[in-house]
Regions:
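Conserved beta-strand hairpin/beta-sheet module of binuclear metal-dependent hydrolase folds
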Residues: 1-43, 116-127, 132-133
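Active-site HxH/HxHxD metal-binding segment of metal-dependent hydrolases
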Residues: 11-12, 25, 32-105, 190, ...
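Divalent metal-coordination and catalytic microenvironments
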Residues: 19, 29, 54, 66, ...
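Active-site neighborhood of phospho(di)ester-bond hydrolases with catalytic His/Asp-centered motifs
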Residues: 28, 48-56, 73-78, 108-110, ...
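Accessory terminal helices/loops
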Residues: 152-163, 170-246
Length: 246
């Protein structure tokens, strides 16, 4: 049986993910247990593991119910254990072997102290560390300098061919900010057009790649910690001057 991957939206803009390889399956950031169970059923999967990219409740809120209903093991970084209760700590771990599922773990503190990125079969699940066109804020237990260091030194060292799969779809809000910073950015303009075309068609946005984000995302185009911190502060206060055409 080939490996399978699913992304599912819940609430307005959250994403959860299902990873399946053979008889083994894991859920990532299943904040809505009903949606998570429906996706798993659609794929004929019984997830044995629940992985969390960070501890915020909109991503971890389904863990307790899913653990009870599925008998699943919950994994997350211990630095975020004040928000949820992982059965296994991801701190210091660079690899996970969960049955047939093999993932790389990249610790990326900043949005929260225990934020991690999960890499699986050419995909990078970024939680709220990196979004399409933007990055997470640090208002709820985060640290802008640590976030900047993670973007520069952790994300910055990863393969540009990786698909980016974030914890939220904020692309239509983020990319106009990128274009206000650099109105001549063809990469940001093309990506915004792609996202809007998907929305008009009633479809989910296609995933970007890390290389694409390095071209279109101002937080990955910045070259210093100070520059990223400054951009994050500016984004926190930003409101669009005028709608971007298209």
């Amino acid at each position: 049986m080939t490996a399978r991957f699913a992304r599912a939206r819940y609430r307005k803009d959250n994403y959860l993910y299902l990873l399946v390889d053979g008889d083994d399956a894991a859920l990532v950031d299943p904040g809505d247990p009903g949606v998570a169970l429906a996706v798993a059923a659609a794929y004929g999967a019984t997830p044995r593991w629940i992985l969390h990219t960070h501890g915020h409740a909109d991503h971890t809120g389904g863990s307790a119910e899913l653990r009870a209903r599925l008998g699943a093991t919950v994994l997350g970084h211990g630095a975020d254990a004040g928000w949820f209760a992982p059965d296994q700590d991801l701190a210091g771990r660079s690899r996970l072997d969960l049955g047939a599922l093999s993932l790389r773990v990249h610790e990326a503190p900043g949005h929260t102290p225990g934020s991690v990125l999960l890499e699986w079969r050419g995909r990078l699940l970024t939680g709220d560390t990196l979004f399409w066109g933007g990055c997470g804020n640090c208002r709820h237990g985060g640290d802008p300098r640590r976030l900047a260091e993670s973007l520069l030194h952790v994300v910055g060292g990863l393969d540009g061919a990786l698909e980016v799969h974030p914890g939220h779809d904020y692309a239509e809000a983020n990319l106009p900010f990128a274009l206000e910073l650099d109105p001549g950015s063809a990469a940001a303009r093309d990506r915004l057009a792609e996202v809007r075309a998907a929305a008009r068609a009633g479809a989910e946005p296609p995933a970007s790649t890390l290389a694409g984000e390095r071209d279109s995302n101002p937080f990955l185009r910045a070259r210093t910690v100070e520059a990223v911190v400054g951009l994050r502060a500016r984004r926190d206060e930003w409101t669009p001057r005028s709608p971007v055409p298209g």
